[in-house]
Amino acid sequence: MRLGNAYAYCKPSQNVGLKLDLLRGLPGYVGHATSRINRLENQDNYSIKMMRSWPNAYGSALNCSVFDGHGEKGAQLSQLLADKLCSSLDFPEPSWDKQDLKKLVQEYARRFPEGNYWKHKLSTFEKFYNKFIKNCNSKQELLLMKEGDSAILGQNGGRMIFDKMGNIIDKIALLTELDRLRLFYGFARFDLDQCCGLGTAAGSTASSIFLYPYDDPNAPIDEGKDDDSWIISHSGLLKLIVTQVGDSKIILCDQDGIAHALTTTHHINSSRERHRLSIDPSRLDPDAFGETRFLNNFANTRSFGDVAGKPYGISSEPDIFSFLVGNTLHLPRSERSKLPFNGDECFLALVTDGITNKLADQEVVDLITSTVNSWGLKKATPQFVAEETIKFIQAIATKHSDNATCVVVRLSNWGNWPNVDRTGPQRETKLMNAQSNETKLN
């Protein structure tokens, strides 16, 4: 089975506005919904695409992304990203190398000479490249894991995971230097060439997943493997690559129904971001609403566009995380605990801050699982639960609530979580408060 090449996206000005080739090929496996909520315009966008030239034995990867635009031309920029960003990465082998990335940093330094960010990055390029691209091992990529989990890592940061035949599945890291270079260079190049031309009135976040089967890179490629059937019936482990720019979120639901945030938000209150931007926290003052903004203007410290902040460090350099997830049928029981989430995960949810500003991560997961538990697997597909998530946000929204977008990707253990709703009372309280406030206004 081979799915269509088209990606799916939603334009805010349309009710549905979808190219459906891909989604018709994935009934019940990818859900998607978006709404402007109470804003005049929906500046959110999303894309769902099969990448045909991703470097793996199957030759394809499922890419899903959400984009949250801001500024006068925010919708235009998020649409541009949905249309073209990940497509620009879809080729077998990058033709660029380390020196090309250095030249790109030089271009940024020439284009944005006002601040010191790009000059400093250029002067420390070797250190930056070695830390984040060349020698970025699994431990670095899995920085979201708790410190106690570091025991599962082998020497040099590698997970020593073995299959039932005793073969090493993941010896060092899931991503090569070339893989990381593809993402770093590709994002920065696209931002400079495509996004910065929109001027100061546009910016956007970008949160993406790239999902594909784990296979021995030295194994021969069978013709029969060059299809997309693994999305529906793959019985082994999957590589999950996550990239993050901004403050949208990617949440994973494990086999126990527990939420795991796979991304960190790029805000000025993050010590990691303050270090990157060389900012003294004592010089930061919250505004009248209690929010602290970078340069007294920007909610996010990383984004596409936002030209006014580019000289001072607002960049599209992505955080990159890699994980092994999926079906553990071929793993000995003793090896499953070495996986970051113990395998047999249930689903992924990609959501913009119009959702995460209203619901905690566990509430998002529980809203989805409880919807499936209530309606049943036949009715409550990923498409159904994505729409129900947006309906819930609409129900609890206030006058100034932000746009909301939700993409749900079904994984191997869909529907097999415990029948437990850990945050039902919290969601019910939010719903009752919203209804009470609406009654008072009327």
Curated annotation (Swiss-Prot):
Define the transit peptide region by residue numbers: 1-34
Q: Which InterPro entries match?
A: PP2C, PPM-type-like_dom_sf, PPM-type_phosphatase-like_dom
Q: What does it do? A: Protein phosphatase that shows typical type 2C protein phosphatase (PP2C) activity. Catalyzes the dephosphorylation and concomitant reactivation of the E1 alpha subunit (PDA1) of the pyruvate dehydrogenase complex. Required for efficient mitophagy in stationary phase cells.
Q: In what residue span(s) does the PPM-type phosphatase domain sit?
A: 35-411
Q: Does the UniProt entry include the keyword Lyase?
A: no
Q: What happens when the gene is disrupted?
A: Confers rapamycin-sensitivity.
The record's subcellular location field reads: Mitochondrion intermembrane space; Mitochondrion matrix
Keyword annotations for this protein, in alphabetical order, are: Autophagy, Hydrolase, Magnesium, Manganese, Mitochondrion, Protein phosphatase, Transit peptide
Query: Any extra remark in the record?
Result: Present with 432 molecules/cell in log phase SD medium.
Q: Give the E.C. number(s).
A: 3.1.3.16, 3.1.3.43
**Needs which cofactor?**
Mg(2+); Mn(2+)
Q: Which Pfam families match?
A: PP2C
| Chemical reaction(s) catalysed | O-phospho-L-seryl-[pyruvate dehydrogenase E1 alpha subunit] + H2O = L-seryl-[pyruvate dehydrogenase E1 alpha subunit] + phosphate; O-phospho-L-seryl-[protein] + H2O = L-seryl-[protein] + phosphate; O-phospho-L-threonyl-[protein] + H2O = L-threonyl-[protein] + phosphate
Q: What is this protein called?
A: [Pyruvate dehydrogenase [acetyl-transferring]]-phosphatase 2, mitochondrial
Recorded GO molecular functions are: [pyruvate dehydrogenase (acetyl-transferring)]-phosphatase activity; protein serine/threonine phosphatase activity
GO annotations of cellular component type: mitochondrial intermembrane space; mitochondrial matrix; mitochondrion
Give the multimer and partner information. Answer: Interacts with PRO2.
For this entry, list what GO says about its biological process: autophagy of mitochondrion; macroautophagy; regulation of mitophagy; signal transduction
**Presence of keyword Transit peptide:** yes
